[in-house]
Amino acid sequence: MLQFRALDLRSITVLMCDADGNLFPSEEPAFDASAKVTNRFVASLGLSRRFDPEELRLSTTGKNFRTTAVDLAVASGVPIEPALAVRHPGAATTTTDLPSAAQHALTAAQLEGWVQEEKQAVTAHLGQVLRPDPAVLQPLTALARDFLLAAVSSSATARLAACFTATGLDRLIPAELRFSAEDSLLAPRSKPDPAVYLFAGERLGISRWQGLAIEDSVPGAQSAVAAGLQTIGNVAFVPPTERVERVNALRQAGVGAVIWSWGELKRLLDQRRAQAGIQANINRE
């Protein structure tokens, strides 16, 4: 473990875990499926650009497809419906009464269709390729004896359900303890927006000092830090050739430490709990 700043873990009661690339190695297979839909999407906008899965993963990890699709349209100068431009003040826009025959513009209805297509493709693929991982299940099972486990993700609930079933994590983090930036909020707001963490904390009835976020991606870490949470980076499923760069980026995003495995987190929390017990005994004496 690398620690960058002091961590006060005495009040932690809930571990708020990002899902993709953190609880299971879903990033690479997800982008295998997502790239096919993404390329059909950019073609529908009249763009010649195409993405391979690895390129897409490196440029969009931590974001959901909805955000990625709008970002791609804006970056390419494709007009978007004003309702989609809330976070893109400089974007080219068209009127909300855009004629159906208009070419190479993105409406909210069209975006929703692409979001659903990508969701179905990725969910089906992940449900087939993911498997239970003892290196995740064993430490999380032990941690669940002392902490409530929750998932806080940018991904859709259907995708999360398929992943949690395939990896055997259903029993540790059931559906009611999964929070989706795509489906749980009144309006979808992907990380790095802190909305999904703030929503999860409110639903769980905890203060920011009671939740510890564990994130593998920079947008995810930025989301948790912006929500006021102590955050630990996790590079367990980050490709080895990318780990040094990711560790540095996570540090800049504000994480307090970086771990290489869930076992490391278990040892860290056990150590802090033991230290707290010793201090409590000293205080009583």
How would you name each of these model-derived features?
Residues 55-59, 101, 126, 150, ...:
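Short, flexible active-site loop motifs that bind/organize anionic cofactors or intermediates
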Residues 146-147, 228:
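Glycine-centered short loops/turns at secondary-structure junctions
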Residues 5-19, 23-137, 141, 145:
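N-terminal helical cap/lid subdomain that shapes the substrate entry/recognition surface
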Residues 1-14, 137-141, 157-285:
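Asp-based, Mg2+/Mn2+-dependent phosphohydrolase catalytic module
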